[in-house]
Amino acid sequence: MASKIPKLTVFRDRKDPGAYTWSPFVVKLEARLRFSNLSYTTRAGTLTESPKGKLPYVRIEEDDGQSSLLSDSALITKTLIKSGAITDLNANLSPAEAATDLSIRALLEDKLYFLNGHERWISNFYTMRDVGPLSTIPYIPRLIIGQIVYGKITRTLHGQGTGRYSPAEIAALRLETWTAVDALVGDGERWLLGGKGPTEADASLFGFLASSLTASANPETKAIVMGLPSLMEYAERVHKEYFSDYKKWE
């Protein structure tokens, strides 16, 4: 890339500037950019414009006028690190620490994501359709698109495995996972791996915390998180330090 400090636009699942979105991966990416002090603007995105058909995606504009679109929060982060636009937060981790960081991200992004997704899209589908990410679509098309999305997510959750559990089993797994993450955070003002600054896992964790505390389609998850003091202290601290310009959850 021609410039180490590009002009960056993050395309998210809502228009509102100064507000968290319901997507953990959008908030994760925004946290990652703020951890490296890279400024950006936000706009509402569409799945049809995203290179990989999902949110978030970004437009990177260089000083020479060239621009590119990238999807997937992890791939966007790796590209920006490679270009020198943001710092590599994991550069000084030992191999064991790097493995722990990756394991935490996998717990959040490859397990908790599906547990939370079931609560949102299956247990609280109408909230997701009429208040959440589909709410900007006109009503009649929204009904049709909503049923298509519901069918796709139901099949995905069944194939992945979460959809095969009973509601009680999913609730137990969700509580178990959040409680384990709360234990990882522990007491005191520190980051997940106990260092002086955040790592990639911290961006993932804050993404899941802020989106879960903001969304109205996951009341059980929100109640769990609000009942875990270490996680709430962590979320409050990151919000105050890096997102003071954003409206906080209630």
Q: Which residues fall in each region the model found?
A:
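Eukaryotic N-terminal targeting leaders
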Residues: 1-12, 240-250
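Amphipathic alpha-helical segments that form well-ordered structural scaffolds
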Residues: 28-35, 79, 173-184, 237
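Structured helix-beta-strand junction loops
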Residues: 36, 187-188, 241
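Intrinsically disordered, low-complexity polar regions and short flexible loop motifs
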Residues: 230-237
